[in-house]
Amino acid sequence: LAAALVFACCPLLLRKRYGQATLIILLAATLHASALFALPFVFLTRGKAWNRKTLLFLLPTVLVVLFIDRFTNILELLLQETQYKNVVSDWKGFEDNGTNLLRVLVYAVPTLLSLIGLRFIRAENDPLIDLCVNMSIVSTGIYILSAFTSGIFVGRLPIYFSLYNYILLPWELHHMFSKRSVRILTVMMLIFYLFFYFYGLKTFGLL
């Protein structure tokens, strides 16, 4: 429900009503405190797709992955006086090896397509698609981070941004490929996502 409320801010972000969007995110945070994590990205994801701000977000993600041990020590120190003070020790105690790399790759598909087909996005000049691309970049960055830290804790955060992929991916298919290619790709994706769904069920012992 918290993720749905944050996603409902989309029309407000497009109309640049950031105050109202902030209030809704704060409301979502009363349902789940992690919704506050989405607040800075209200401002970071403004502007054209793949702009400097979103690229600057990816830089610290890469640095964290390269220096993961130092990052976890700093994170543990920062969370010491909060309700999340045991997060780092918990994911180490649970032997949490991070988000499965296949899951990271699957959720990164819309982001990768947006980079490959950036000229189509630039030509369309649609603020909604620009927003969706930037949210998708954030989602992918956090998923990459979760692959090297915690799938249980960090791996849950992308839900606030990955919902935009449900707008972005269909747009990419219909604007970047020919009609015949779209049909073939749609069938292939249905098969692959079905496989991915059952793979997820099996991974969690539900199948």
Language-model regions, residue ranges each:
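Membrane-interface transmembrane helices that cradle and orient dolichyl/undecaprenyl
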Residues: L1, V6-G19
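Membrane-interface alpha helices of multi-pass inner-membrane proteins
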Residues: C9-C10, Q20-L44
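Membrane-interface junctions at the ends of membrane-embedded or membrane-associated helices
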Residues: R15-G19, W171-L185
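Alpha-helical transmembrane segments and terminal signal-anchor/GPI-anchor hydrophobic tails
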Residues: T45-L157
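Signature aromatic-anchored transmembrane alpha helix within multi-pass, membrane-resident enzymes
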Residues: L59-P60, S178-F198
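Hydrophobic/aromatic-rich transmembrane helices and adjacent perimembrane loops
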Residues: F153-W171
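Juxtamembrane boundary at the C-terminal end of a transmembrane helix
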Residues: F198-L207
